């Protein structure tokens, strides 16, 4: 039997499908080999059209896990300090909230974080955005600041973080300029009677970071020895 005969004998068929699994609307090519086996091509993920075996166990949602690790923290202060520090659930707080939460609570301050993002709140405050081509996370920050203002916190903490913590011996850990300086935009267009604290911070150098934390917290009436102990715990939590 020749190869041409085998190819002509084959009952292979193909058809075009349109995946409705998300807004990408991928065009999928389905090849049916006539023996119960099929092959899909053109898909950008394998959520609905997969060439591998279907797992019996549903995979974990890494974003839900990260969100829980970052923000599911009990607010238990070590004293009866009445100061409520508001922190926006936005921008670099998705990396640094464990550090600041631990530092402040160990110093006896109450940490109040803004609520989860939602589109209706975003639309309500998007008019405050100064530039249309700014990134979406920055645009979203305005609704989180408004949320903290509505919670009537005593102060809003939005540090001017120039350098992030270095990893893997890279030469530079310079922060995104928008993330670094967006507090200046907030202060210009969203000012209120609630103070906006924007201390300069660098996570690249431990000694510098400790001094910056001491400068800020002593201005709030926290004693140096308490800050130093809290700093050690905040470091450990940030590295965990």
Question: For each of these PLM feature ranges, what is it?
Answer:
Residues 1-240:
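An N-terminal assembly and electron-transfer interface module characteristic of large anaerobic redox
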């Amino acid at each position: 039997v020749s190869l041409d005969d085998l190819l002509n004998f084959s009952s292979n068929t193909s058809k075009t499908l349109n995946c409705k699994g998300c807004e990408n609307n991928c065009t999928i090519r389905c090849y049916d080999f006539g023996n119960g086996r099929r092959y899909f091509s053109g898909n950008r993920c394998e959520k609905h059209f997969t060439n591998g075996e279907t797992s019996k166990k549903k995979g974990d949602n890494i974003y839900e896990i990260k969100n829980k690790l970052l923000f599911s923290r009990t607010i238990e202060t070590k004293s009866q300090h009445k100061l409520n520090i508001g922190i926006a659930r936005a921008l670099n707080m998705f990396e640094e909230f464990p550090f600041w939460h631990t530092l402040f609570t160990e110093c006896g301050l109450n940490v109040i974080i803004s609520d989860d993002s939602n589109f209706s709140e975003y639309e309500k405050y998007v008019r405050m955005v100064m530039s249309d081509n700014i990134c979406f996370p920055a645009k979203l920050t305005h609704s989180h600041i408004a949320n903290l203002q509505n919670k009537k916190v005593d102060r809003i903490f939005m540090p001017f973080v120039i350098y992030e913590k270095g990893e893997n011996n890279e030469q530079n850990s310079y922060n995104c300029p928008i993330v670094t300086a967006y507090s200046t935009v907030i202060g210009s267009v969203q000012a209120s009677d609630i103070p906006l604290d924007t201390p300069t911070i660098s996570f690249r150098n431990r000694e510098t970071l400790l001094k910056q934390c001491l400068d800020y917290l002593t201005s709030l009436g926290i004693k140096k020895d308490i800050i130093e102990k809290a700093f050690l715990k905040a470091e450990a939590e940030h590295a965990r």
